[in-house]
């Protein structure tokens, strides 16, 4: 059996020469700042422009908080933590 080639272990595959890096690490911001200012309370366009209500002015106390932000969408209220 001298004619049979000798079995040798397969050559190790050549991997990357640089060490593997883990996933990128992101720095978390300390404070979260909104790009726009939070909405102000009050119904938009309510007050002196209603016929018969000229003497009342625009300082109207709103009892229901939904009325105070009726000019906004729900996602805008949620963005600023109102709901």
From Swiss-Prot:
Point out the coiled-coil segments of this chain.
none
Biological process annotations from GO? positive regulation of epidermal growth factor receptor signaling pathway; positive regulation of G protein-coupled receptor signaling pathway; positive regulation of MAPK cascade; visual perception
Q: What is its EC number?
A: 3.1.4.35
Superkingdom of origin: Eukaryota
Q: Which GO terms describe its molecular function?
A: 3',5'-cyclic-GMP phosphodiesterase activity; cGMP binding
Which intervals carry biased composition (Basic residues)?
22-43
Complexes and interactors? Tetramer composed of two catalytic chains (alpha and beta), and two inhibitory chains (gamma).
**Function of this protein?**
Participates in processes of transmission and amplification of the visual signal. cGMP-PDEs are the effector molecules in G-protein-mediated phototransduction in vertebrate rods and cones.
Q: What is known of its domains?
A: The C-terminal region is important in conferring inhibition.
Q: Mind telling me what this protein is named?
A: Retinal cone rhodopsin-sensitive cGMP 3',5'-cyclic phosphodiesterase subunit gamma
């Amino acid at each position: 059996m001298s004619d049979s080639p000798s079995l040798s272990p397969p050559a190790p595959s050549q991997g990357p020469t640089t060490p593997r890096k883990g996933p990128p690490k992101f720095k978390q911001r300390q404070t979260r700042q909104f790009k726009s200012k939070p909405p102000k309370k009050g119904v938009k366009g309510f007050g002196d422009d209603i016929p018969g209500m000229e003497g009342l002015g625009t300082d109207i106390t709103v009892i229901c908080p939904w009325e105070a932000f009726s000019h906004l969408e729900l996602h805008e209220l949620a963005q600023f933590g109102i709901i």
